[in-house]
Amino acid sequence: MALCQVRFFSQSLGKASEMVVVLPDSGEGPFPVLYLLHGLSDDASIWLRRSRIEWYVRDLPLMVVMPDGGRGWYTNAVNGDACEDHIMKDVMGQTERLFPAARDRQHRAIAGLSMGGYGAMSLALHHPESFVAAASLSGAVAVGHKPITDEMPPDFKRIFGENPQGSDKDLFALIKKVDRSQLPKLWLDCGVDDFLIEDNRAFHAHLESLGIPHVYHEFPGAHTWDYWDEHIQQVLQFVMEAMG
């Protein structure tokens, strides 16, 4: 297994960025790819530092790409960085240029925790032609479904606008617009003691009301790395089964 740290210039952000890539030990590729997103205030290295993701994929024919998403929520800000374009154009472009990565939908998936859970769902719903599966662990899935208040961090208004409900940043609205035949396979999980549990329950209920197939789990636990380290293993199984 190889571990690569890649520094590159992101045309979408207009600045340097980085990603960490885990490559399988054997085979020549092209390899299926999981794009794995971090949470708010973390970076490209956090999954390696706080979980055993490298160990969990040791026997899988799977590349794992962990990009730096900053605090940008993996969306193109109303007034600011084009973080969606950064992932879809720069990160994916560099991955496919530098590594033997699969380039077809059937062998690409995306997942993330917290902010990254929102990002995984948002990117998969904006680009269903690019991902066969998307998974959210403890995702902030309702962040675009509510008014942005003064109690929230100041960059939220810059990213989402003052009232993003109903916009393309609202997952509840966005999923209604996606062609059902093009929807990726969806996974949502959250700890029962997580402060985001009610948002996840609401999104799950919304998907059920629309008749949209998805996997939903509530597990013991909170918004912690112990929780994510345990349940990323199930997400990996879900992703591999979706890829076939």
Residue ranges and their predicted role:
Residues M1-G244:
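Non-catalytic cap/lid and distal C-terminal segments of serine-dependent acyl enzymes
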